[in-house]
Amino acid sequence: MATQKETTRKRDKSVNFRLGLRNMLAQIHPDISVQTEALSELSNIAVFLGKKISHGAVTLLPEGTKTIKSSAVLLAAGDLYGKDLGRHAVGEMTKAVTRYGSAKESKEGSRSSKAKLQISVARSERLLREHGGCSRVSEGAAVALAAAIEYFMGEVLELAGNAARDSKKVRISVKHITLAIQNDAALFAVVGKGVFSGAGVSLISVPIPRKKARKTTEKEASSPKKKAAPKKKKAASKQKKSLSDKELAKLTKKELAKYEKEQGMSPGY
């Protein structure tokens, strides 16, 4: 028997958060799904945030410190997200680190489940190690980064799902993600236009045109409507002027006969 050749697939070694984002969408919008291309773009945004926060956390470390801790990640995320988003994000990150610390001794479940997060803590730690410039990363720092990514992506998923629902769609597309970020000033300030490699769809609001008077077509212009024929005027019956007896006496016989004929009188003989 001839042996069948086994085809092997090269494993993608790049970090992605597709699984966690699917789980987040199921919680935020249970009745809406996401297209494969849109899910890849969402994962790219999450990786972009992880890299930016990792670089920021390293710059905030004191001199001589070789370990990235949760405090540095908190400061970097708050600085990247701005005033409003940063305040809420830091609160969620602190809660996640606290939950993980209380459930750390338990051997059951992953680090993400202990912190009650959908974004993978292990993949967030990998981003910190690869792009943070430090080989030492504390467990709290990885949890804080995962919580920071999850908070921001939760905002994006909520707005993108609303945009899909407004468009009467049941699947989120790249266009809905673009629309969600462009219409929110805080999200757009963080992400901007540089992430949408597969989309690049710029939606411009166009006012609804007003209804204009109907224009005549060339066919209608070439054959104008026929004018209605004027109504025929009824011929007014001429009233014959009747003569007095004195005037009749002056008439000759021929004139009198003519007059009587016009008046419809029988001739007098």
From Swiss-Prot:
On induction, the UniProt comment says:
Expression of viral histones begins 2-4 hpi and continues along the infectious cycle.
Q: InterPro entries given for it?
A: Histone-fold, Histone_H2A, Histone_H2A/H2B/H3
Residue ranges of the region described as Histone fold: 1-168
- The UniProt annotation puts the region (Disordered) at 210-249
Q: Which UniProt keywords apply?
A: DNA condensation, Host cytoplasm, Host nucleus, Virion
Any single biological process term in GO: chromosome condensation
Q: Does the keyword Repeat apply?
A: no
List the GO cellular component terms.
Answer: host cell cytoplasm; host cell nucleus; virion component
- What is its subcellular localisation? Host nucleus; Host cytoplasm; Virion
What's one Pfam family here?
Answer: Histone
For molecular function, the Gene Ontology terms on record are: DNA binding; protein heterodimerization activity; structural constituent of chromatin
Location (main, coarse): host cell
Question: Which SUPFAM superfamilies does the record associate with it?
Answer: Histone-fold
Give the PANTHER family listed for this entry: HISTONE H2A
For domains, the record's comment is: The N-terminus is similar to eukaryotic H2B, whereas the central region is similar to eukaryotic H2A.
Name it.
Histone doublet H2B-H2A
